């Protein structure tokens, strides 16, 4: 990576939505106006005490925040080395971190007078969270989901429908998350007058990367205060899984200026980087443009986006949020690839030692947390963002292991 020197990581993005050489708005002319309108509305809302109060009230009373930090004592003993701590985003209403963002964006949609929200989803958690807040606020909700992901996440598809959402299968391309995002953006261009697009990750054109980060930053702010209150200090290291990267940046952001905290992002290495069947945009990708922003992407020598693979639908995406690309280049965050088999092993070990079923996405972070812990002393603290629960993945894991459920 480069020799970028950063004095204050909280100073990004700049006024044009750039994180160093990443980010920006690489979109069709028809989207420039709607994006400017959205940016102006968001900037006004985030400085409005009434909006912030309403958002914080929903986080407390509807989402159930704060989420606790749990000391995984049996897992720590089994792994050996450092103490493993879990930030329990899986305990939120709807079962993942996604609701932190959808609550904020739905409140913004209502403030802007929009009556319809659309969303894309991979693992289904963002779709469920979007359908949930739409039901609460009385908004129409349409969720775009790749046909491949619909097959491996049927429980979440049914949950969305129970909540009143329309789920639209996307069959183009690889029929996964990137294709769902493409279709959602087409819908938004066509119906922008009354429609608000709730992007679920820190990707897309400005202002989405910063807006989604800001709504998820509650995770890191809570964790920082909890670490100081419960342990008297910050963690020695932390990990989170990275697909688009919303849960990760939500945790990382509060700690970016704390040089003593080592930060790691766990990308999906799938069947292994060398096989080409992976979704590791930073570890094995290169700079390019995808979904309206410049970032790291999985592409060929001509810049064409390649199909990706991960056992985890939520990490099966050929790009990453531009802030993560910037953090990788600056050296502040180290990104590693975790293979499917490593994530599955971590899933089972956490279940057996702590009675917690982690999402397959989160299991990538758990796997790297265990690797870090083994090489650290017993009094070291490693914090892992347990971004979601694994109920949605039981059928996928059972099928992979030849079990009928």
Swiss-Prot record:
Modified residues (N6-(pyridoxal phosphate)lysine): 98
Keywords assigned by UniProt, alphabetized: Amino-acid biosynthesis, Aromatic amino acid biosynthesis, Lyase, Pyridoxal phosphate, Tryptophan biosynthesis
Xref: SUPFAM superfamilies: Tryptophan synthase beta subunit-like PLP-dependent enzymes
Reactions it catalyzes: (1S,2R)-1-C-(indol-3-yl)glycerol 3-phosphate + L-serine = D-glyceraldehyde 3-phosphate + L-tryptophan + H2O
Protein EC: 4.2.1.20
Pathway(s) served: Amino-acid biosynthesis; L-tryptophan biosynthesis; L-tryptophan from chorismate: step 5/5
Task performed by this protein: The beta subunit is responsible for the synthesis of L-tryptophan from indole and L-serine.
Protein name in UniProt: Tryptophan synthase beta chain
Organism: Xylella fastidiosa (strain Temecula1 / ATCC 700964)
Lineage: Bacteria, Pseudomonadati, Pseudomonadota, Gammaproteobacteria, Lysobacterales
Gene: trpB
């Amino acid at each position: 990576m480069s020799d970028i020197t950063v004095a204050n990581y909280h100073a990004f993005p700049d006024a044009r939505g750039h994180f160093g050489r990443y980010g920006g708005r690489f979109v069709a002319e028809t989207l420039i106006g709607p994006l400017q309108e959205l940016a102006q509305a968001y900037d006004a809302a985030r400085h409005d005490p009434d909006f912030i109060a309403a958002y914080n009230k929903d986080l407390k009373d509807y989402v159930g925040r704060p989420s606790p930090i749990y000391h995984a004592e049996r897992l720590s003993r089994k792994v050996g080395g450092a103490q493993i701590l879990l930030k329990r985003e899986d305990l939120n209403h709807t079962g993942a971190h996604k609701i932190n963002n959808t609550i904020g964006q739905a409140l913004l949609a209502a403030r802007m007078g929009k009556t319809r929200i659309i969303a894309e989803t991979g693992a289904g958690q963002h779709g469920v969270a979007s359908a949930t807040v739409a039901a609460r606020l009385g908004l129409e909700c349409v969720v775009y989901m790749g046909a491949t992901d619909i097959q491996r996440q049927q429980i979440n598809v049914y949950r969305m429908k129970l909540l009143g959402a329309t789920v639209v299968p996307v069959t183009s391309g690889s029929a996964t998350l990137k294709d769902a995002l493409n279709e959602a953006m087409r819908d938004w261009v066509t119906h922008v007058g009354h429609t608000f697009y709730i992007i679920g990750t820190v990707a897309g054109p400005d202002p989405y990367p910063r807006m989604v980060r800001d709504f998820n930053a509650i995770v890191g702010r809570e964790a920082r205060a909890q670490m100081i209150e419960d342990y008297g200090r910050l963690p020695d290291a932390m990990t989170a899984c990275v697909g688009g990267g919303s849960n990760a940046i939500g945790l990382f952001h509060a700690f970016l200026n704390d040089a003593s905290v080592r930060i790691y992002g766990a990308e999906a290495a799938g069947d292994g980087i060398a096989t080409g069947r992976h979704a590791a945009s930073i570890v094995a990708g290169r700079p390019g443009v995808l979904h309206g922003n410049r970032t790291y992407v999985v592409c060929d020598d001509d810049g064409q986006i390649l199909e990706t693979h991960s056992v985890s639908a939520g990490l099966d995406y050929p790009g990453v949020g531009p802030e993560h690309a910037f953090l990788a280049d600056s050296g502040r965050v180290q990104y590693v690839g975790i293979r499917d088999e490593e994530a599955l092993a971590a899933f089972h070990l956490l279940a057996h030692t702590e009675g917690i079923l982690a999402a397959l996405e989160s299991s990538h972070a758990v796997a790297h947390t265990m690797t870090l812990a083994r090489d650290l002393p017993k009094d070291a603290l490693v914090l892992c963002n347990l971004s979601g629960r694994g109920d949605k993945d039981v059928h996928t894991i059972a099928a992979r292991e030849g079990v009928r459920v």
